[in-house]
UniProtKB/Swiss-Prot annotation:
This is N-acetylmuramic acid 6-phosphate etherase 2. Its EC number is 4.2.1.126. GO terms for biological process: 1,6-anhydro-N-acetyl-beta-muramic acid catabolic process; amino sugar catabolic process; N-acetylmuramic acid catabolic process; peptidoglycan turnover. The lineage of its organism: Bacteria, Pseudomonadati, Pseudomonadota, Gammaproteobacteria, Vibrionales. GO terms for molecular function: carbohydrate derivative binding; carbon-oxygen lyase activity; ether hydrolase activity. The active site is at E85, E116.
């Protein structure tokens, strides 16, 4: 069935930019900047739906489930970007948050013709992951009508997985297909139909909230410190030390000693210092409290 794209908000013309090709560079950028300021407010309007999705993802993680993003083009790339940042930031397994893009890995750098129109591909990509009812699938598409994503959402619902959609058009097909509809309506783009702009920015803000919120709820943040960060490069090794110092008030030397005694596991080092435990005692207490530092400190 053909869709009249001109009826979509994301495909409509923006009256603020109809003469943008006649403006000076600074005037052009002012128009873009003014339009961008609308994005955060659009996201604010859908915080309840984002919160509901965060809670669903947190519950999935607690039950051994995964978060799977699905999208085509820019939307798919944003999902992959968000997923790829979770292991170094929060020490998660690469399979805990997964990003799928229509057309596969080659589509990350180069568009794959007709991939987004393939309903079956969306279903097959999820089947290849051995999706279960414990997983959460989040479909991403500015238009809210991408067949690849709709196919995935349909399959996910059929096996009992929780589904959510992120789109920038009201009353779209994806909103109806998902258990939770996140619809930040950002309005027409500065360049008509260029949904990598405001719509893409809104999607990125929502994705930031989904994984950050779920990781906080899963005990991977103490205060506002990323206490499960892994030491995969020199910058992150130094960040680990700084995190332990900030969390405990210890000196850098004390922080380094604790980290070196526990294979540079931030949570363990923090608990060692704050609760005056050795590495094995701290690891054991953390495990007993599912990795939550505050609970381990209270030890109730």
């Amino acid at each position: 069935m053909k869709i009249d794209l001109s009826r979509l908000v994301t495909e409509s013309r923006n009256p603020a930019s109809t003469e943008i090709d006649t403006l000076s560079t600074i005037e052009m950028l002012q128009v873009i900047n003014e339009e961008d300021q609308k994005v955060a407010l659009a996201v604010k309007a859908v915080l309840p739906q984002i919160a509901k999705t965060v809670n669903a993802i947190t519950a999935a993680f607690a039950n051994g489930g995964r978060l799977v993003y699905m999208g085509a083009g820019t939307s798919g790339r944003l999902g992959i970007l968000d997923a790829s940042e979770c292991p170094p930031t929060y020490g998660t397994h690469p399979d805990m948050v997964i990003g799928l893009i229509a057309g596969g890995h080659q589509a990350i750098l180069k568009a794959v013709e007709n991939a987004e129109d393939d309903v079956k591909m969306g279903q097959d990509d999820l089947k290849a992951l051995h999706l279960t009812k414990h997983d959460v699938v989040v479909g991403i598409a500015a238009s809210g009508r991408t067949p690849y994503v709709l196919g995935g959402l349909e399959y996910a619902k059929s096996i009992g997985a929780t589904t959510a959609s992120i789109a920038c058009n009201p009353e779209c097909a994806m909103a109806k297909a998902a258990d939770i509809a996140i619809l930040p309506i950002v309005g027409a783009e500065v360049v008509t139909g260029s949904s990598r702009m405001k719509a893409g920015t809104a999607q990125k803000l929502v994705l930031n909230m989904l994984t950050t919120g779920a990781m906080i709820r899963s005990g991977k943040v103490f205060g506002n410190l990323m206490v499960d960060v892994e030491a995969t490069n020199a910058k992150l090794i130094q960040r680990q030390t700084n995190i332990v110092v900030e969390a405990t008030g210890a000196s850098k030397e004390e922080a380094e000693r604790a980290l070196n005694a526990c294979d540079r596991h931030c949570k363990t080092a923090i608990l060692m210092i704050l609760a005056d435990l050795d590495a094995e005692q701290a690891k054991s207490r953390l495990a007993a409290h599912n990795g939550f530092i505050r609970a381990a400190l209270n030890n109730n």
